[in-house]
């Protein structure tokens, strides 16, 4: 483990070890996929985990939320539920054009799982269907319905990583 990786919070280290090396990909490819999911390098100019962490801490642009929501066919109610942002606060964030660090962290979690699903399943369309459909590995719940908490996101990630490694069920 590199010194830079060791200095990161545990969740980022786990994400780096598991997600960035799915199918043998180097870390920079995983970051590029996640940046694309969050709206692209113009919105999220990060090339490293550290840069991405700093952007999340500063608050991601509201346009990143729009990119994730449209990219994964999320309606307003799903965004409010998954990100735990009241509708009035969401409207204020849209006017301010920036999310809080806490909201950004939840959006990062959603984007990370979405990017992982796209990577594992091979396309955004397949990831979209999978995220919205009931899943036996999640007790019949749709993966998106689990992403409002870290524990739920970890369960969804475990299911995706099992799929990536050919373990079904």
Where are these regions (language model features)?
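Non-transmembrane "mature" sequence context
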Residues: 2-169
